[in-house]
């Protein structure tokens, strides 16, 4: 999604709409939490003025993220709206972070799309069902997950001999 300043000034109108689908599989390398990302749709509008171009667009798609509890893949749909301003020449009076200076006479919004998606990743995400196929194991070597009820009924093996002695005393 690149446009040169020359292309933008040759537009018949002072604005144009765009609707593109892009593959951003490299995001899986930038953030290991993203296990897979579907093709991302970028749809929006650009308004062209003599010294600047403003973009108002929506980024939508779906990515697979690990469940914070079970590490099962969880689909995470996203829809992000953003506004970005590109100016053709640097001026000292602009201090806004959302203002981008056009370099090499080319405007490329792909890095902005990537950044917005990375910022959209939640700190924690949980799958709907804990018993979902592929959920975390319930036991392993020298450990197992048990309920509180089972924990209460279980006797500490170190005290098992003492319990036998107490039962013998009760019987006598």
Swiss-Prot record:
Offer one Pfam family short name for this entry: YceD
Q: Which domain of life is it from?
A: Bacteria
Region span, Disordered:
130-154
Could you tell me what this protein is called? Uncharacterized protein YlbN
Q: Which gene encodes it?
A: ylbN
